Amino acid sequence: MEKYILSIDQGTTSSRAIIFDHDGNVVSVAQQEFLQYYPKPGWVEHDPNEIWATTMGVIADAMARGNIKRSQISAIGITNQRETTVIWDAETGKPVHNAIVWQDRRTSKICDNLKEKGLEETIKHKTGLMVDAYFSGTKIKWILDNVEGAREKAEAGKLRFGTIDTWLIWKLTNGKVHVTDYTNASRTMIYNIFDLKWDEDLLKELNIPSSLLPEVKPSSQIYGNTDADVFGAEVPIAGIAGDQQAATFGQVCYEKGMAKNTYGTGCFMLMNTGEDPIESKHGLLTTIAYGINGKVNYALEGSIFVTGAAVQWLRDELKIVDSAADTEYYATKVKDNGGVYVVPAFVGLGAPYWDMYARGTIVGLTRGSSKAHIVRATLESIAYQTRDVLEAMEADSGIKLKTLRVDGGAALNNFLMQFQSDILGVEVERPVVNETTALGAAYLAGLAVGYWNGQEELLRKWKRDALFTPKMAEDERERLYAGWKRAVERARNWIEEK
């Protein structure tokens, strides 16, 4: 009987289950969207129970579509939207509040207080992160401070915290396993990425009891088995990585200096810096790429908050396209952007600016500006933001990138990928298997149970689907990019109630 690896890819807008065979090919896939809650401006929430229900739904769907039995699954890998914070009752398993999503900005004032106390450098030295509402630490504090009875229960050891990986494993094991991996822990702003442990000083500063926290383990090992009553069989859960780190692993960026960019709701570029963490001087994050076989690989990361979400905005709010795929058609209907720039700073700007008070703007409009110009400028904004990050990355690492590996939904947009290559001046490579995030989690799980023999075997499985090479003249590239920099300045520091 053939064996497979099940990958759970729990994202910001949907839950997905992908089943891979030994060649790393997708055998079956299922996806289900779930609700986004926006209780106040700048607030973004998910219902953890809906995340769980959709996850179980897509697993059943993927198994049925592939005609695969539970007994044919060798291991389960989990990859997840990072930073998103769930706190639940240890006895009942019931969340005390909706999950606070990574995009949520409600804790900006808590972050401002940390900065006023002069803690920015301390936090950066310990965690590799900026002080920002993006990360889990201040979200945990907010829930404990604002949900009635939560702090008392936490102090009594009756609550549990987890990022989404932790929540799903808790549920899959019927409350037996409370665990996360290095990559997810490295996104909480309370985990010391050098000592590889929760940081007591930061927990004290944010008033977070340590009894809340999961055990932190490598990204590839058996954490426990699924509960037979919950899952239908006892199957090892053997791989965990935050979505961007999983994509890095799935793109087999195992060598120092290799980089990938994932085009999803946001855009995330990671460069493997090997076993040596590089502290950024240019607005990037130092993060853990993966931990495997007793070693930890670090990465520099540029987190861009809004890329694919800007395309959703064109579709859902402005209603000027019917689907994301339409953007390529409209973008090619005009010869250039017509001087129009869209800065999609809907929730502020991430790397390398870290401006929580920036807001979205469209500049350069004239009477001749058309729908096609706005669509094209929105796509171009994704490529410009990626260049912002790459310039910072090259400055920090001293490594000149030759090729960027790409994945995610928008990586299938050929117009965008060609423009990306043009504006960076480097080659852009798209793999045959675009499901690199899920593939990375599958690889981590498969390695832990001996389904694959080692990373060398995985290197041989990576295959290129398309190569985009720069075709734009240098002066044109720099002229367009200079326009983008001017547009960003217009968007910055827009919100005044600081």
From Swiss-Prot:
Binding sites annotated in the UniProt record for ADP: T12, R16, T265, G308, G409, N413
Residues making up the signal peptide according to the UniProt record: none
Full protein name: Glycerol kinase
This protein's pathway: Polyol metabolism; glycerol degradation via glycerol kinase pathway; sn-glycerol 3-phosphate from glycerol: step 1/1
Keyword check for Cell wall biogenesis/degradation: no
EC number: 2.7.1.30
Binding site for ATP: T12, T13, S14, T265, G308, Q312, G409
GO BP: glycerol catabolic process; glycerol metabolic process; glycerol-3-phosphate metabolic process
Entry keywords, A to Z: ATP-binding, Glycerol metabolism, Kinase, Nucleotide-binding, Transferase
